[in-house]
Amino acid sequence: MATRTQFENSNEIGVFSKLTNTYCLVAVGGSENFYSAFEAELGDAIPIVHTTIAGTRIIGRMTAGNRRGLLVPTQTTDQELQHLRNSLPDSVKIQRVEERLSALGNVICCNDYVALVHPDIDRETEELISDVLGVEVFRQTISGNILVGSYCSLSNQGGLVHPQTSVQDQEELSSLLQVPLVAGTVNRGSSVVGAGMVVNDYLAVTGLDTTAPELSVIESIFRLQDAQPESISGNLRDTLIETYS
């Protein structure tokens, strides 16, 4: 399922939220429409946590995470950290990262298996990404851009990259990541796809300006047409087994 919304007149959904397969973070103080877009699709499948990071609302740009963990910058307050620990599932590791490039969401793009990172990220940060998120880490650029987190949106099903990414680069990245990639835009032609949308294995949320063709590319590359939360499909499977056994 792909859906469109806005955060206080901004279409940059990936700036104000973070979506993984086990949790969803949303910035505080948005309009009800913004929250209800997530609540309507996610229901009780995963927790939706209202938070700030380092006192800011740009939580999607400050954090990086997947179903196993969440990395936050060292400026994150103790209170914010405690709130996250109380709200996220116990299986999710939360780790402060001392990194000069503190907008982690701009310099890390990951799914549950691999991460692309800014070429100049600290060696210690690279090790933390690997340990906390349980992923293989590759230092990369996307179409010559070092802010890989801003110009790539990734799930375990597929990925959307900067529209000027060459076919050769797409193929190289695709074989690294082991998922199909497509070059495209969100929010009526914006190339900053990482900041313009969030996605997990069954839901994408983009800005209100996203056109129908852009939305259909997103639904197709992330295989969202009949996707549903694992917990729901798991329950359904159990029910079917019981019914037919």
Swiss-Prot record:
Present with 18600 molecules/cell in log phase SD medium. It comes from the Eukaryota. SMART domains: eIF6. The keyword Nucleus applies. Its main location: cytoplasm. Keywords: Cytoplasm, Initiation factor, Nucleus, Phosphoprotein, Protein biosynthesis, Ribosome biogenesis. HAMAP family: eIF_6. It holds the Pfam family eIF-6. The modification Phosphoserine is found at residues 174-175, 231. One of its GO terms (molecular function) is ribosomal large subunit binding. PANTHER family: TRANSLATION INITIATION FACTOR 6. One of its GO terms (cellular component) is cytosol. One of its GO terms (biological process) is maturation of 5.8S rRNA. Belongs to the eIF-6 family. InterPro entries: eIF6. Phosphorylation at Ser-174 and Ser-175 promotes nuclear export. Coiled coil: none annotated. It comes from Saccharomyces cerevisiae (strain ATCC 204508 / S288c). Binds to the 60S ribosomal subunit and prevents its association with the 40S ribosomal subunit to form the 80S initiation complex in the cytoplasm. Is also involved in ribosome biogenesis. Associates with pre-60S subunits in the nucleus and is involved in its nuclear export. Cytoplasmic release of TIF6 from 60S subunits and nuclear relocalization is promoted by the GTPase RIA1/EFL1 and by SDO1. Also required for pre-rRNA processing. This is Eukaryotic translation initiation factor 6. It is found in: Cytoplasm; Nucleus, Nucleolus. Monomer. Associates with the 60S ribosomal subunit.
